[in-house]
Amino acid sequence: MPVIKVRENESFDVALRRFKRSCEKAGLLAEVRAREFYEKPTTIRKREKASLAKRHAKRNFRENARNTRLY
């Protein structure tokens, strides 16, 4: 849990903004969304495998585009 200390003469808005930024860096919102509903282990594996395939396809596309001459 991110903790911030409110500095002297710091407005509430600035402190709230710093807290939100620290929560975002810690990945709290993503974690809450991921744990909101139960996800079966097979579904998790399937989603991760699809993500891996997408990453590889994107990398291959970039490598091929880099080697292709446009003239």
UniProtKB/Swiss-Prot annotation:
GO biological process: translation
GO cellular component, one term: ribonucleoprotein complex
Entry annotated with the keyword Ribonucleoprotein: yes
Ranges annotated as biased composition (Basic residues): 48-59
InterPro entries assigned: Ribosomal_bS21, Ribosomal_bS21_CS, Ribosomal_bS21_sf
Lineage top rank: taxon: Bacteria
Biased composition (Basic and acidic residues): 60-71
Disulfide bond residue pairs: none
Disordered: annotated span: 48-71
Keyword Ribonucleoprotein in annotation: yes
GO molecular function: structural constituent of ribosome
Keyword terms of this UniProt record: Ribonucleoprotein, Ribosomal protein
Listed PANTHER family: MITOCHONDRIAL 28S RIBOSOMAL PROTEIN S21, SMALL RIBOSOMAL SUBUNIT PROTEIN BS21
Stated family: Belongs to the bacterial ribosomal protein bS21 family.
Protein name: Small ribosomal subunit protein bS21
Record organism: Glaesserella parasuis serovar 5 (strain SH0165) (Haemophilus parasuis)
Gene: rpsU
